[in-house]
Design a protein with these regions (language model features):
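Short, conserved charged micro-motifs
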Residues: 554-560
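A common structural junction motif
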Residues: 431-433, 562-572
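Active-site-proximal helix-loop-helix substrate-binding element of RNase H-like nuclease domains
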Residues: 37-47, 51-58, 63-174, 184, ...
Length: 588
Protein backbone atom coordinates (compact mmCIF):
# COMPACT_ATOMS: atom_id res chain seq x y z
CA UNK A 1 0.00 0.00 0.00
CA UNK A 2 1.10 3.57 -0.51
CA UNK A 3 1.94 5.62 2.55
CA UNK A 4 1.87 9.01 0.89
CA UNK A 5 -0.20 11.53 2.75
CA UNK A 6 -3.42 12.77 1.15
CA UNK A 7 -5.00 15.60 3.07
CA UNK A 8 -8.72 15.67 3.80
CA UNK A 9 -9.26 11.97 3.02
CA UNK A 10 -11.47 10.38 5.73
CA UNK A 11 -9.40 8.36 8.19
CA UNK A 12 -10.25 4.78 9.11
CA UNK A 13 -8.32 2.67 11.63
CA UNK A 14 -7.67 -1.04 11.14
CA UNK A 15 -6.27 -3.68 13.45
CA UNK A 16 -5.48 -7.31 12.67
CA UNK A 17 -5.18 -10.33 14.94
CA UNK A 18 -3.10 -13.30 13.83
CA UNK A 19 -1.90 -16.57 15.26
CA UNK A 20 1.43 -16.40 17.05
CA UNK A 21 3.34 -18.83 19.19
CA UNK A 22 6.78 -20.15 20.00
CA UNK A 23 9.07 -19.62 16.99
CA UNK A 24 6.15 -18.22 15.01
CA UNK A 25 6.18 -14.50 15.57
CA UNK A 26 7.66 -11.35 14.08
CA UNK A 27 10.60 -11.22 16.48
CA UNK A 28 11.70 -14.75 15.64
CA UNK A 29 11.03 -14.78 11.91
CA UNK A 30 10.92 -11.19 10.72
CA UNK A 31 7.80 -9.67 9.21
CA UNK A 32 7.89 -11.27 5.74
CA UNK A 33 8.65 -14.80 6.93
CA UNK A 34 6.06 -14.57 9.67
CA UNK A 35 3.37 -13.23 7.35
CA UNK A 36 4.07 -16.01 4.84
CA UNK A 37 4.38 -18.76 7.43
CA UNK A 38 1.62 -21.39 6.96
CA UNK A 39 0.69 -21.01 10.64
CA UNK A 40 0.22 -17.24 10.41
CA UNK A 41 -3.55 -17.08 10.13
CA UNK A 42 -4.96 -13.53 9.92
CA UNK A 43 -8.20 -14.56 11.58
CA UNK A 44 -9.69 -11.27 12.77
CA UNK A 45 -9.87 -7.65 11.73
CA UNK A 46 -11.30 -4.54 13.38
CA UNK A 47 -12.28 -1.44 11.42
CA UNK A 48 -13.26 1.89 13.02
CA UNK A 49 -13.99 5.25 11.43
CA UNK A 50 -16.76 7.80 11.19
CA UNK A 51 -19.84 5.67 10.56
CA UNK A 52 -17.82 2.41 10.49
CA UNK A 53 -17.40 -0.10 13.31
CA UNK A 54 -16.87 -3.69 12.20
CA UNK A 55 -15.08 -6.82 13.42
CA UNK A 56 -14.72 -10.16 11.69
CA UNK A 57 -12.65 -12.16 9.23
CA UNK A 58 -11.02 -10.02 6.50
CA UNK A 59 -12.71 -12.14 3.80
CA UNK A 60 -16.12 -11.12 5.13
CA UNK A 61 -15.52 -7.35 5.06
CA UNK A 62 -16.95 -5.01 2.44
CA UNK A 63 -13.65 -3.50 1.31
CA UNK A 64 -15.35 -0.95 -0.90
CA UNK A 65 -16.05 0.96 2.33
CA UNK A 66 -12.33 1.77 2.51
CA UNK A 67 -11.90 2.97 -1.07
CA UNK A 68 -10.38 6.47 -0.97
CA UNK A 69 -9.85 6.30 2.78
CA UNK A 70 -6.70 7.19 4.73
CA UNK A 71 -5.76 3.99 6.56
CA UNK A 72 -4.56 4.16 10.15
CA UNK A 73 -2.86 1.43 12.16
CA UNK A 74 -0.92 1.48 15.38
CA UNK A 75 1.90 -0.48 13.75
CA UNK A 76 1.53 0.29 10.08
CA UNK A 77 4.88 -1.35 9.39
CA UNK A 78 3.10 -4.66 10.06
CA UNK A 79 -0.51 -3.88 9.20
CA UNK A 80 0.53 -2.33 5.90
CA UNK A 81 2.18 -5.60 4.89
CA UNK A 82 -0.97 -7.48 5.87
CA UNK A 83 -3.06 -5.19 3.68
CA UNK A 84 -0.65 -5.69 0.77
CA UNK A 85 -0.87 -9.47 1.13
CA UNK A 86 -4.66 -9.37 1.30
CA UNK A 87 -4.61 -7.37 -1.94
CA UNK A 88 -2.26 -9.86 -3.63
CA UNK A 89 -4.44 -12.74 -2.48
CA UNK A 90 -7.53 -11.10 -3.95
CA UNK A 91 -9.22 -10.53 -0.59
CA UNK A 92 -9.09 -6.78 -1.23
CA UNK A 93 -10.56 -6.14 -4.70
CA UNK A 94 -8.22 -4.46 -7.18
CA UNK A 95 -10.53 -1.46 -7.62
CA UNK A 96 -10.18 -0.55 -3.92
CA UNK A 97 -7.45 2.07 -3.57
CA UNK A 98 -6.44 3.71 -0.31
CA UNK A 99 -5.64 7.41 -0.03
CA UNK A 100 -2.55 6.74 2.07
CA UNK A 101 -1.61 5.57 5.52
CA UNK A 102 -0.55 6.79 8.93
CA UNK A 103 1.00 5.02 11.91
CA UNK A 104 -0.13 6.07 15.39
CA UNK A 105 2.83 4.27 17.00
CA UNK A 106 5.13 6.69 15.15
CA UNK A 107 2.86 9.59 16.07
CA UNK A 108 3.05 8.53 19.71
CA UNK A 109 6.84 8.42 19.92
CA UNK A 110 7.12 11.78 18.18
CA UNK A 111 4.98 13.18 21.01
CA UNK A 112 7.18 11.57 23.64
CA UNK A 113 4.78 8.76 24.53
CA UNK A 114 5.49 5.01 24.55
CA UNK A 115 5.44 3.20 21.21
CA UNK A 116 3.15 0.41 22.40
CA UNK A 117 -0.61 0.96 22.20
CA UNK A 118 -1.28 0.53 25.91
CA UNK A 119 1.35 3.12 26.85
CA UNK A 120 0.28 5.53 24.11
CA UNK A 121 -3.37 5.28 25.20
CA UNK A 122 -2.47 5.84 28.84
CA UNK A 123 -0.27 8.88 28.23
CA UNK A 124 -2.06 10.55 25.30
CA UNK A 125 -5.71 9.61 25.91
CA UNK A 126 -5.78 8.94 29.64
CA UNK A 127 -7.34 5.50 29.22
CA UNK A 128 -6.17 2.04 30.23
CA UNK A 129 -5.92 -0.56 27.49
CA UNK A 130 -5.21 -4.11 28.56
CA UNK A 131 -3.40 -6.59 26.32
CA UNK A 132 -4.23 -9.60 28.49
CA UNK A 133 -6.37 -11.25 25.82
CA UNK A 134 -3.57 -11.04 23.27
CA UNK A 135 -1.28 -12.71 25.78
CA UNK A 136 -3.88 -15.43 26.39
CA UNK A 137 -4.07 -16.10 22.64
CA UNK A 138 -0.40 -17.09 22.39
CA UNK A 139 -0.29 -20.51 20.75
CA UNK A 140 -4.07 -20.54 20.27
CA UNK A 141 -6.10 -20.47 17.06
CA UNK A 142 -9.39 -18.73 16.36
CA UNK A 143 -11.11 -22.10 16.76
CA UNK A 144 -9.51 -22.46 20.19
CA UNK A 145 -10.98 -19.10 21.17
CA UNK A 146 -14.42 -20.09 19.86
CA UNK A 147 -14.36 -23.35 21.81
CA UNK A 148 -13.29 -21.47 24.95
CA UNK A 149 -16.17 -19.01 24.55
CA UNK A 150 -13.82 -16.05 23.91
CA UNK A 151 -14.83 -15.18 20.32
CA UNK A 152 -16.96 -12.19 21.33
CA UNK A 153 -14.23 -11.02 23.68
CA UNK A 154 -11.78 -11.08 20.79
CA UNK A 155 -14.13 -9.09 18.56
CA UNK A 156 -14.50 -6.47 21.29
CA UNK A 157 -10.74 -6.49 21.79
CA UNK A 158 -9.86 -5.86 18.15
CA UNK A 159 -12.54 -3.16 17.90
CA UNK A 160 -11.24 -1.46 21.02
CA UNK A 161 -7.67 -1.40 19.65
CA UNK A 162 -8.87 0.02 16.33
CA UNK A 163 -10.95 2.61 18.17
CA UNK A 164 -7.97 3.58 20.33
CA UNK A 165 -5.82 4.00 17.23
CA UNK A 166 -8.53 6.14 15.62
CA UNK A 167 -8.85 8.29 18.76
CA UNK A 168 -5.10 8.84 18.96
CA UNK A 169 -5.07 10.12 15.39
CA UNK A 170 -8.13 12.30 15.76
CA UNK A 171 -6.80 13.95 18.91
CA UNK A 172 -3.10 14.33 18.11
CA UNK A 173 -2.40 14.07 14.37
CA UNK A 174 -2.30 17.86 14.01
CA UNK A 175 0.75 17.89 16.33
CA UNK A 176 2.77 15.75 13.91
CA UNK A 177 4.35 17.85 11.11
CA UNK A 178 4.03 16.66 7.53
CA UNK A 179 7.78 16.33 7.01
CA UNK A 180 8.05 14.11 10.10
CA UNK A 181 5.24 11.92 8.77
CA UNK A 182 7.18 11.65 5.52
CA UNK A 183 10.32 10.59 7.39
CA UNK A 184 8.36 7.94 9.27
CA UNK A 185 6.90 6.62 6.03
CA UNK A 186 10.29 6.58 4.29
CA UNK A 187 11.69 4.56 7.18
CA UNK A 188 8.86 2.06 6.89
CA UNK A 189 8.87 1.66 3.11
CA UNK A 190 12.67 1.26 3.02
CA UNK A 191 12.32 -1.60 5.49
CA UNK A 192 9.61 -3.17 3.34
CA UNK A 193 11.76 -2.95 0.19
CA UNK A 194 14.67 -4.43 2.11
CA UNK A 195 18.31 -5.05 1.31
CA UNK A 196 19.69 -7.39 -1.32
CA UNK A 197 21.95 -10.02 0.24
CA UNK A 198 24.87 -11.84 -1.37
CA UNK A 199 23.75 -15.25 -0.12
CA UNK A 200 26.84 -17.13 -1.28
CA UNK A 201 29.16 -14.72 0.49
CA UNK A 202 27.01 -14.89 3.63
CA UNK A 203 27.10 -18.70 3.60
CA UNK A 204 30.87 -18.69 3.03
CA UNK A 205 31.28 -16.29 5.96
CA UNK A 206 29.09 -18.48 8.17
CA UNK A 207 31.25 -21.50 7.35
CA UNK A 208 34.40 -19.57 8.25
CA UNK A 209 32.87 -18.62 11.58
CA UNK A 210 31.91 -22.22 12.26
CA UNK A 211 35.57 -23.17 11.84
CA UNK A 212 36.67 -20.43 14.23
CA UNK A 213 34.13 -21.59 16.81
CA UNK A 214 35.22 -25.22 16.43
CA UNK A 215 38.87 -24.30 16.95
CA UNK A 216 38.04 -22.09 19.93
CA UNK A 217 35.89 -24.80 21.48
CA UNK A 218 38.89 -27.14 21.47
CA UNK A 219 40.78 -24.70 23.70
CA UNK A 220 37.97 -24.20 26.24
CA UNK A 221 38.37 -26.80 28.99
CA UNK A 222 34.70 -27.18 29.90
CA UNK A 223 33.46 -27.28 26.29
CA UNK A 224 33.83 -31.05 25.93
CA UNK A 225 31.00 -31.79 28.37
CA UNK A 226 27.35 -30.91 28.64
CA UNK A 227 28.06 -27.41 29.92
CA UNK A 228 27.35 -24.58 27.47
CA UNK A 229 30.49 -23.08 25.98
CA UNK A 230 29.44 -19.57 27.01
CA UNK A 231 28.36 -20.61 30.52
CA UNK A 232 29.11 -17.76 32.92
CA UNK A 233 29.07 -20.23 35.81
CA UNK A 234 31.64 -22.52 34.18
CA UNK A 235 33.83 -19.53 33.32
CA UNK A 236 33.76 -18.32 36.92
CA UNK A 237 34.57 -21.76 38.31
CA UNK A 238 37.53 -22.16 35.95
CA UNK A 239 38.83 -18.70 36.84
CA UNK A 240 38.73 -19.53 40.55
CA UNK A 241 40.41 -22.88 39.89
CA UNK A 242 43.27 -20.97 38.24
CA UNK A 243 43.40 -18.32 41.00
CA UNK A 244 42.38 -15.44 38.76
CA UNK A 245 39.33 -13.20 39.14
CA UNK A 246 36.45 -13.74 36.72
CA UNK A 247 35.86 -10.92 34.22
CA UNK A 248 33.59 -8.10 35.44
CA UNK A 249 31.41 -8.80 32.39
CA UNK A 250 31.55 -10.75 29.13
CA UNK A 251 30.29 -7.90 26.97
CA UNK A 252 32.65 -7.28 24.06
CA UNK A 253 31.88 -3.56 24.30
CA UNK A 254 32.93 -3.35 27.96
CA UNK A 255 36.45 -1.88 28.34
CA UNK A 256 36.80 -3.75 31.66
CA UNK A 257 36.19 -7.07 29.90
CA UNK A 258 38.74 -6.17 27.23
CA UNK A 259 41.29 -5.22 29.88
CA UNK A 260 40.72 -8.56 31.64
CA UNK A 261 41.23 -10.44 28.36
CA UNK A 262 44.42 -8.52 27.63
CA UNK A 263 45.77 -9.21 31.12
CA UNK A 264 45.18 -12.96 31.19
CA UNK A 265 44.97 -13.91 27.51
CA UNK A 266 48.67 -14.72 27.06
CA UNK A 267 48.84 -16.84 30.22
CA UNK A 268 45.62 -18.78 29.66
CA UNK A 269 44.80 -19.72 26.02
CA UNK A 270 41.18 -20.40 26.92
CA UNK A 271 40.70 -16.68 27.67
CA UNK A 272 41.43 -15.79 24.04
CA UNK A 273 39.43 -18.82 22.91
CA UNK A 274 36.39 -17.62 24.87
CA UNK A 275 36.73 -14.19 23.31
CA UNK A 276 37.01 -15.60 19.79
CA UNK A 277 34.13 -18.01 20.32
CA UNK A 278 31.88 -15.26 21.69
CA UNK A 279 32.65 -12.83 18.86
CA UNK A 280 32.34 -15.49 16.16
CA UNK A 281 29.07 -16.70 17.65
CA UNK A 282 27.69 -13.16 17.63
CA UNK A 283 28.62 -12.71 13.97
CA UNK A 284 27.24 -16.13 13.03
CA UNK A 285 23.91 -15.30 14.67
CA UNK A 286 23.65 -12.08 12.65
CA UNK A 287 24.45 -14.00 9.48
CA UNK A 288 21.88 -16.64 10.36
CA UNK A 289 19.16 -14.03 10.75
CA UNK A 290 20.29 -12.36 7.53
CA UNK A 291 20.17 -15.52 5.41
CA UNK A 292 16.98 -16.89 6.96
CA UNK A 293 15.16 -13.67 6.13
CA UNK A 294 16.13 -13.55 2.46
CA UNK A 295 12.93 -13.49 0.43
CA UNK A 296 12.82 -16.12 -2.32
CA UNK A 297 10.90 -13.66 -4.49
CA UNK A 298 13.69 -11.11 -4.94
CA UNK A 299 16.76 -12.14 -2.91
CA UNK A 300 16.23 -9.26 -0.50
CA UNK A 301 15.85 -9.19 3.26
CA UNK A 302 13.26 -6.93 4.84
CA UNK A 303 14.49 -5.13 7.94
CA UNK A 304 13.14 -3.02 10.75
CA UNK A 305 14.26 0.41 11.85
CA UNK A 306 12.50 2.56 14.42
CA UNK A 307 11.55 6.09 13.47
CA UNK A 308 12.18 8.30 16.51
CA UNK A 309 13.98 5.48 18.27
CA UNK A 310 15.29 7.82 20.97
CA UNK A 311 14.52 11.02 22.83
CA UNK A 312 16.57 13.12 20.41
CA UNK A 313 14.62 11.82 17.42
CA UNK A 314 17.39 9.64 16.02
CA UNK A 315 16.56 6.31 14.46
CA UNK A 316 17.33 3.01 16.16
CA UNK A 317 17.55 -0.63 15.13
CA UNK A 318 14.72 -3.13 15.40
CA UNK A 319 13.67 -6.75 14.88
CA UNK A 320 16.88 -8.64 15.84
CA UNK A 321 18.91 -7.45 12.85
CA UNK A 322 20.17 -3.96 13.57
CA UNK A 323 21.40 -2.31 10.36
CA UNK A 324 22.75 0.55 12.47
CA UNK A 325 25.14 -1.67 14.39
CA UNK A 326 26.88 -3.93 11.89
CA UNK A 327 30.57 -4.55 12.66
CA UNK A 328 33.05 -2.80 10.38
CA UNK A 329 35.45 -4.69 8.18
CA UNK A 330 36.32 -8.36 8.13
CA UNK A 331 36.54 -10.45 11.28
CA UNK A 332 37.43 -14.16 11.23
CA UNK A 333 36.87 -14.21 7.47
CA UNK A 334 33.39 -12.71 7.74
CA UNK A 335 32.40 -9.28 6.45
CA UNK A 336 28.75 -8.69 7.33
CA UNK A 337 28.59 -5.28 5.69
CA UNK A 338 29.99 -6.71 2.47
CA UNK A 339 27.07 -9.16 2.30
CA UNK A 340 24.75 -6.22 1.57
CA UNK A 341 24.84 -5.47 -2.17
CA UNK A 342 22.88 -3.34 -4.64
CA UNK A 343 20.09 -4.80 -6.73
CA UNK A 344 21.03 -5.90 -10.27
CA UNK A 345 21.88 -2.94 -12.48
CA UNK A 346 22.50 -0.66 -9.50
CA UNK A 347 25.41 0.50 -7.37
CA UNK A 348 25.78 2.04 -3.93
CA UNK A 349 26.82 5.58 -3.18
CA UNK A 350 27.47 5.71 0.56
CA UNK A 351 27.54 9.30 1.75
CA UNK A 352 27.84 10.69 5.25
CA UNK A 353 27.75 14.13 6.79
CA UNK A 354 31.32 14.89 7.84
CA UNK A 355 31.74 15.61 11.57
CA UNK A 356 28.19 16.89 11.75
CA UNK A 357 27.96 16.94 15.55
CA UNK A 358 31.14 18.98 16.22
CA UNK A 359 30.04 21.45 13.54
CA UNK A 360 26.62 21.79 15.13
CA UNK A 361 28.19 22.21 18.58
CA UNK A 362 30.41 25.02 17.29
CA UNK A 363 27.37 26.73 15.77
CA UNK A 364 25.25 26.36 18.90
CA UNK A 365 27.89 27.79 21.23
CA UNK A 366 28.87 30.59 18.83
CA UNK A 367 32.45 29.51 18.12
CA UNK A 368 32.86 31.88 15.18
CA UNK A 369 36.63 31.41 15.06
CA UNK A 370 36.22 27.72 14.31
CA UNK A 371 33.26 28.27 11.97
CA UNK A 372 35.17 30.86 9.94
CA UNK A 373 38.02 28.40 9.41
CA UNK A 374 35.55 25.75 8.25
CA UNK A 375 33.98 28.23 5.84
CA UNK A 376 37.47 28.84 4.42
CA UNK A 377 38.01 25.13 3.83
CA UNK A 378 40.19 24.24 6.81
CA UNK A 379 39.53 20.62 7.93
CA UNK A 380 37.69 20.42 11.25
CA UNK A 381 40.36 18.76 13.38
CA UNK A 382 43.04 21.07 12.04
CA UNK A 383 40.78 24.07 12.66
CA UNK A 384 40.37 22.93 16.27
CA UNK A 385 44.13 22.57 16.66
CA UNK A 386 44.70 26.05 15.25
CA UNK A 387 42.02 27.57 17.49
CA UNK A 388 42.83 25.85 20.77
CA UNK A 389 46.04 23.78 20.56
CA UNK A 390 48.54 26.29 19.24
CA UNK A 391 49.05 24.76 15.81
CA UNK A 392 50.50 27.28 13.33
CA UNK A 393 52.04 24.99 10.73
CA UNK A 394 50.69 23.68 7.45
CA UNK A 395 48.62 20.56 6.83
CA UNK A 396 48.25 19.12 10.33
CA UNK A 397 47.42 15.57 9.28
CA UNK A 398 50.57 15.30 7.15
CA UNK A 399 52.98 17.33 9.26
CA UNK A 400 52.00 16.17 12.75
CA UNK A 401 49.79 13.06 12.67
CA UNK A 402 50.07 12.55 16.44
CA UNK A 403 48.72 16.02 17.16
CA UNK A 404 46.03 15.45 14.52
CA UNK A 405 44.93 12.26 16.31
CA UNK A 406 44.81 14.07 19.64
CA UNK A 407 42.80 16.92 18.09
CA UNK A 408 40.37 14.35 16.70
CA UNK A 409 40.02 12.72 20.12
CA UNK A 410 39.40 16.10 21.76
CA UNK A 411 36.78 17.12 19.22
CA UNK A 412 34.92 13.82 19.29
CA UNK A 413 35.26 13.06 22.98
CA UNK A 414 35.34 16.19 25.12
CA UNK A 415 32.42 18.29 23.93
CA UNK A 416 29.93 16.87 26.43
CA UNK A 417 31.70 16.74 29.79
CA UNK A 418 33.76 13.58 29.45
CA UNK A 419 36.22 13.20 32.35
CA UNK A 420 39.83 11.94 32.25
CA UNK A 421 39.11 8.28 33.01
CA UNK A 422 36.55 7.97 30.26
CA UNK A 423 38.64 10.02 27.85
CA UNK A 424 41.37 7.37 27.93
CA UNK A 425 38.91 4.92 26.37
CA UNK A 426 37.38 7.54 24.05
CA UNK A 427 40.81 8.44 22.67
CA UNK A 428 41.53 4.78 21.99
CA UNK A 429 38.24 3.93 20.29
CA UNK A 430 37.59 7.18 18.42
CA UNK A 431 41.09 8.26 17.46
CA UNK A 432 43.19 5.12 17.84
CA UNK A 433 45.63 6.60 20.35
CA UNK A 434 46.76 5.32 23.74
CA UNK A 435 47.17 7.93 26.48
CA UNK A 436 47.78 7.71 30.20
CA UNK A 437 45.46 8.97 32.92
CA UNK A 438 47.85 11.86 33.52
CA UNK A 439 47.84 12.92 29.87
CA UNK A 440 44.06 12.53 29.79
CA UNK A 441 43.67 14.78 32.83
CA UNK A 442 45.88 17.48 31.29
CA UNK A 443 44.03 17.19 27.98
CA UNK A 444 40.62 17.57 29.60
CA UNK A 445 41.79 20.60 31.57
CA UNK A 446 43.34 22.15 28.46
CA UNK A 447 40.20 21.56 26.39
CA UNK A 448 37.92 23.15 28.95
CA UNK A 449 40.15 26.18 29.49
CA UNK A 450 40.41 26.84 25.75
CA UNK A 451 36.77 26.15 24.85
CA UNK A 452 34.94 28.43 27.24
CA UNK A 453 31.98 28.86 24.89
CA UNK A 454 31.25 25.15 25.03
CA UNK A 455 31.48 25.21 28.83
CA UNK A 456 29.15 28.21 28.90
CA UNK A 457 26.60 26.26 26.85
CA UNK A 458 26.77 23.36 29.33
CA UNK A 459 26.29 25.74 32.24
CA UNK A 460 23.42 27.59 30.60
CA UNK A 461 21.55 24.38 29.84
CA UNK A 462 22.15 23.02 33.33
CA UNK A 463 20.98 26.24 34.98
CA UNK A 464 17.80 26.38 32.91
CA UNK A 465 17.15 22.68 33.54
CA UNK A 466 17.41 23.12 37.31
CA UNK A 467 15.26 26.23 37.27
CA UNK A 468 12.53 24.04 35.79
CA UNK A 469 12.33 21.89 38.93
CA UNK A 470 8.78 20.60 39.37
CA UNK A 471 7.92 21.36 35.75
CA UNK A 472 9.05 20.45 32.26
CA UNK A 473 12.26 21.77 30.74
CA UNK A 474 11.61 22.45 27.06
CA UNK A 475 14.39 23.19 24.59
CA UNK A 476 13.25 24.61 21.26
CA UNK A 477 15.54 23.42 18.49
CA UNK A 478 16.59 25.65 15.57
CA UNK A 479 14.33 23.55 13.31
CA UNK A 480 11.30 24.38 15.47
CA UNK A 481 11.08 20.92 17.00
CA UNK A 482 11.17 20.65 20.79
CA UNK A 483 13.14 18.51 23.23
CA UNK A 484 11.13 18.01 26.39
CA UNK A 485 12.41 16.88 29.78
CA UNK A 486 9.35 16.13 31.90
CA UNK A 487 8.91 16.45 35.65
CA UNK A 488 12.36 17.79 36.49
CA UNK A 489 13.32 16.87 40.04
CA UNK A 490 16.29 17.35 42.39
CA UNK A 491 15.27 14.51 44.69
CA UNK A 492 18.15 12.04 44.82
CA UNK A 493 20.02 13.95 42.13
CA UNK A 494 18.82 15.98 39.17
CA UNK A 495 16.59 13.83 36.98
CA UNK A 496 13.75 14.04 34.47
CA UNK A 497 11.59 11.80 32.32
CA UNK A 498 12.10 11.97 28.57
CA UNK A 499 9.25 9.57 27.82
CA UNK A 500 5.80 10.35 29.16
CA UNK A 501 5.34 8.10 32.16
CA UNK A 502 8.84 6.70 31.68
CA UNK A 503 11.68 6.10 34.08
CA UNK A 504 13.76 8.89 35.55
CA UNK A 505 17.12 9.65 33.95
CA UNK A 506 19.89 11.79 35.49
CA UNK A 507 20.97 14.87 33.55
CA UNK A 508 23.75 17.42 33.81
CA UNK A 509 24.96 20.21 31.56
CA UNK A 510 27.19 18.10 29.34
CA UNK A 511 24.52 15.46 28.80
CA UNK A 512 21.89 18.09 28.00
CA UNK A 513 24.34 19.58 25.51
CA UNK A 514 24.91 16.18 23.90
CA UNK A 515 21.16 15.66 23.55
CA UNK A 516 20.78 19.10 22.00
CA UNK A 517 23.59 18.56 19.49
CA UNK A 518 22.35 15.09 18.53
CA UNK A 519 18.82 16.39 18.03
CA UNK A 520 19.97 19.25 15.79
CA UNK A 521 22.27 16.93 13.83
CA UNK A 522 19.37 14.51 13.42
CA UNK A 523 17.21 17.26 11.96
CA UNK A 524 19.98 18.24 9.54
CA UNK A 525 20.32 14.63 8.40
CA UNK A 526 16.55 14.25 8.15
CA UNK A 527 16.38 17.19 5.74
CA UNK A 528 19.13 15.54 3.68
CA UNK A 529 17.05 12.36 3.44
CA UNK A 530 14.02 14.31 2.28
CA UNK A 531 16.05 16.22 -0.34
CA UNK A 532 17.50 12.98 -1.69
CA UNK A 533 14.03 11.48 -1.91
CA UNK A 534 12.63 14.47 -3.77
CA UNK A 535 15.25 14.21 -6.51
CA UNK A 536 14.58 10.49 -6.92
CA UNK A 537 17.52 9.04 -4.99
CA UNK A 538 16.59 5.79 -3.28
CA UNK A 539 18.08 5.56 0.23
CA UNK A 540 17.87 1.86 1.04
CA UNK A 541 18.97 2.38 4.64
CA UNK A 542 20.90 4.82 6.76
CA UNK A 543 23.24 4.58 9.72
CA UNK A 544 23.47 7.56 12.07
CA UNK A 545 24.64 10.34 9.68
CA UNK A 546 25.31 8.08 6.69
CA UNK A 547 22.93 7.42 3.79
CA UNK A 548 23.30 4.30 1.66
CA UNK A 549 21.92 5.27 -1.75
CA UNK A 550 21.09 2.69 -4.43
CA UNK A 551 21.54 4.39 -7.79
CA UNK A 552 22.12 3.75 -11.46
CA UNK A 553 25.75 3.35 -12.61
CA UNK A 554 27.21 6.66 -13.64
CA UNK A 555 25.41 8.66 -10.96
CA UNK A 556 27.75 11.44 -9.84
CA UNK A 557 28.74 10.98 -6.17
CA UNK A 558 29.61 14.67 -5.97
CA UNK A 559 25.96 15.49 -6.61
CA UNK A 560 24.97 13.33 -3.64
CA UNK A 561 27.59 15.15 -1.56
CA UNK A 562 26.22 18.51 -2.72
CA UNK A 563 22.64 17.60 -1.81
CA UNK A 564 23.58 16.32 1.63
CA UNK A 565 25.83 19.26 2.50
CA UNK A 566 23.18 21.94 1.93
CA UNK A 567 22.80 23.93 5.14
CA UNK A 568 19.14 24.31 6.21
CA UNK A 569 17.84 27.87 6.42
CA UNK A 570 17.40 27.49 10.17
CA UNK A 571 21.12 26.63 10.58
CA UNK A 572 22.46 29.58 8.61
CA UNK A 573 26.19 30.07 9.06
CA UNK A 574 27.02 26.47 9.90
CA UNK A 575 29.21 25.05 7.11
CA UNK A 576 28.33 21.43 6.33
CA UNK A 577 30.33 18.87 4.38
CA UNK A 578 29.66 15.38 3.07
CA UNK A 579 31.86 12.59 1.77
CA UNK A 580 30.71 9.87 -0.63
CA UNK A 581 32.16 6.63 -1.95
CA UNK A 582 30.93 4.53 -4.88
CA UNK A 583 30.88 0.81 -4.17
CA UNK A 584 29.33 -2.48 -5.22
CA UNK A 585 29.05 -3.60 -1.59
CA UNK A 586 28.27 -1.83 1.64
CA UNK A 587 31.68 -1.10 3.06
CA UNK A 588 31.83 2.01 5.27
Amino acid sequence: MTTDTLKDAPAVAVDFESFYGKDCDIKSLGQWNYLNNPNCDIYLMGVVGDGISWAGHPKDFDWSLLHGKFILAHNLSWDGLVLAKLARDGVIPSHVQFAGGGCTANLSVYLGAPRNLAGAARELLGVDVTKDLRTWMKGKTWQDAVEAGRADDLREYVLRDAQTCFNLWQKHAHEWPEHERELANLTMTAGWAGLRIDQKLAEHAAAALERVMWEARNDIPWADGDVAVLSIKALGEHCRANSIPPPPSTSEDDPACEAWENKYGAQFPWVAAMRNYRKANMLREKLRVMTERIRPTDGCMGYGMKYFGGHTGRWSGDARFNVQNLPKGEMFGADLRGCIVPRPGKQFIVCDLSQIEPRVLAWLCGDTQLLDQLLNGVPLYEAHARSTMGWTGGNLKKENPDLYALAKARVLGLGYGCGPAKFVEVARTMAGIAISQQVAARTVESFRSSNRKIIALWNRLQTDFRRSSGNAFVVELPSGRKLTYRDVSSSGGWTARVERGGRRIPFYGGKLCENLVQAVARDVFAESLLRLRRVGVDVVFHVHDEAVCEVAPGTDPHEIERIMSITPDWLHGCPLAAEAVVTTRYCK
